[in-house]
């Protein structure tokens, strides 16, 4: 198993007696999209700034590809691309000129600069407006330009702070698709957001923050089972022959099978059994029309977690 690309061990940031980040621990694997999620003021941005060497660490440690961001900030900067909440481009310069300027600062060789910039702008869908001034860009276009800068840099990890903040739903969907494409090109990604449900589809794992601490961490499915209980819900729609309910019920890991209406079957399972359910439909002589896996929402998980925590506190106080 390869070493994690990011490690945080008992990472803490204090301002006087107040803890902005309070002893958090997490790893990010190579090729993973890892979400730092939670409400504003929970410690997500402070965590990002410590990972990048842009804020002092009070105690604990962080490593980015084995480098200490406090002692080796330039090594981290060479490997990591950063998209802050507010992207700082020059409004009176074109997208191309902005990237040429940052490419020079990064030390990218002149002979490859032009091709890298053109390729990066094409990948984020800005080729047609490459010569337009950035002052005419929408927030979504500015975010795309920020991703283009990360692509141009050939970063091995992208750290994105609230990338969908202020975007309409369609612009958010398009930006998240671009983030997925970074992963497809071998880039590891850390992103923060307070918009839990908007980004849950893109994250492999998430850490849910509250008051500077990580209160939950894992895949959405793992968190759902831990907090909400129950298992996976697999929905099957099929033109079936007799005996399909029996075949589905007999699958290992199936807890129950319901038929809310003819041709629809809802399975509660211990794990994702979509492949096995599809095979059962075929074996029963049926025709599979649709197969879906229902995932709990992060908003639901987060809300339930704190409802339960508050109830526990009330019981102990009574």
Q: Where are the regions a protein language model picked out?
A:
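C-terminal coupling/interaction segments
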Residues: 269-318
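ABC transporter nucleotide-binding domains
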Residues: 3-8, 13-211, 215-216
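A generic structural signal for secondary-structure junctions
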Residues: 81, 98, 107, 146, ...
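ABC-family P-loop ATPase nucleotide-binding domain
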Residues: 1-12, 308-318
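Short loop or secondary-structure boundary microenvironments that flank
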Residues: 66, 73, 238, 271, ...
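ABC transporter nucleotide-binding domain
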Residues: 176-268
């Amino acid at each position: 198993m390869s070493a994690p690309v990011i490690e945080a061990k008992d990472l803490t940031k204090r301002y006087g007696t107040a803890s902005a980040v309070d002893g958090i621990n997490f790893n990010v694997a190579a090729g993973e999209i890892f979400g730092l999620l939670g409400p504003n003021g929970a410690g997500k941005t402070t965590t990002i700034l410590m990972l990048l060497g842009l804020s002092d660490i009070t105690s604990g440690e962080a490593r980015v590809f084995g480098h200490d961001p406090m002692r080796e900030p330039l090594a981290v900067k060479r490997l990591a691309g950063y998209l802050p909440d507010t992207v700082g481009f020059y409004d009176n310069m074109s997208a191309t000129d902005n990237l040429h300027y940052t490419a020079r600062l990064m030390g990218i060789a002149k002979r490859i600069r032009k091709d890298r910039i053109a390729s990066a702008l094409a990948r984020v869908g800005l080729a047609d407006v490459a010569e337009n001034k950035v002052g005419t860009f929408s927030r979504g276009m500015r975010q795309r330009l920020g991703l283009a800068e990360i692509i141009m840099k050939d970063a091995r990890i992208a750290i994105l702070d609230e990338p969908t903040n202020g975007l309409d739903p369609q612009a958010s969907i398009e930006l998240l698709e671009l983030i997925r494409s970074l992963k497809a090109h071998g880039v590891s990604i850390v992103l923060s957001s307070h918009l839990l449900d908007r980004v849950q589809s893109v994250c492999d794992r998430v850490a849910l923050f509250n008051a500077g601490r990580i209160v939950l961490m894992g895949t959405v499915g793992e968190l759902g089972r831990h907090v909400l209980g129950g298992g996976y819900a697999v929905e099957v729609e099929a033109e079936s022959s007799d005996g399909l309910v029996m075949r589905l019920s007999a699958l290992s890991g199936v807890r129950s099978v319901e038929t809310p209406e003819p041709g629809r079957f809802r399975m509660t399972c211990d794990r994702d059994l979509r492949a096995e359910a599809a095979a059962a439909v075929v074996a029963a002589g049926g025709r599979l029309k649709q197969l879906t896996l229902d995932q709990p929402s992060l908003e639901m998980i987060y809300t339930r977690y704190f409802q339960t925590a508050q109830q526990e506190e009330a019981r102990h106080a009574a």
